[in-house]
Amino acid sequence: MADDTAPHPPTQRYPLLDLLSWYNKCAPQTHCTPQRPLTTTTQTVQTEQHTTCPSKPHRHENDTDSVDSRHHSTCSTQTPASPASPAHPWTLDCVGSELTVKTVTSDGTTVEVRLRL
């Protein structure tokens, strides 16, 4: 049985902000497993895979390219295509302490947000 105390994936009007908020609640101290598919006013996102994001690896000041490959995990969610609404794929990748959120808007514009924690 799933842990009912675990944070749930975002379900509100602003999916990018909700997704980032959900990530912040989940990483790196807990393992996040949504209890149900992610639903927003414009799309439904099915969970494909979840992994725990690693703790922040040791870095030297101004050393931006030294992420240890052993500290790599990927969380990915993707919207199923349907005739009624075009697919809006979402990916959530956390490499070391960096969070990247990618999406494609309804007009085909690719949006990528990168955060370094």
UniProtKB/Swiss-Prot annotation:
Domain of life the protein comes from: Viruses
Post-translational modification remark: Phosphorylated by host ERK. The phosphorylation triggers a structural change that enhances keratin binding and protein stability.
Parts of the chain that traverse the membrane: none
GO biological process: symbiont-mediated arrest of host cell cycle during G2/M transition
Localization annotation: Host cytoplasm; Host nucleus
Basic and acidic residues bias locations: 60-71
UniProtKB keywords: Early protein, Host cytoplasm, Host G2/M cell cycle arrest by virus, Host nucleus, Host-virus interaction, Modulation of host cell cycle by virus, Phosphoprotein
UniProt region (Disordered), positions on chain: 31-89
Biased composition (Low complexity): 31-53
UniProt GO cellular component terms: host cell cytoplasm; host cell nucleus
Broad class of the protein's primary localization: host cell
Assembly and binders: Assembles into oligomeric complexes. Interacts with host CDK1. Interacts with host SRPK1; this interaction may favor expression of late viral transcripts. Interacts with host cytokeratin components KRT8 and KRT18.
Other comments on record: The major E4 form is first synthesized as an E1^E4 fusion protein from spliced E1^E4 transcripts, such that the first few amino acids of the E4 protein are derived from the N terminus of E1.
Family in the record: Belongs to the papillomaviridae E4 protein family.
Reported function: Contributes to multiple aspects of the viral life cycle including viral genome amplification, suppression of suprabasal cell differentiation and egress of newly formed virions. Induces host cell cycle arrest at the G2 phase by associating with and preventing the nuclear entry of host CDK1/cyclin B1 complexes. Inhibits cellular DNA replication by preventing loading of host replication licensing proteins MCM2 and MCM7 onto chromatin. Within the cytoplasm, associates with host kinase SRPK1, a splicing factor regulator, and inhibits its activity.
Name the record gives this protein: Protein E4
Species per Swiss-Prot/TrEMBL record: Human papillomavirus 42
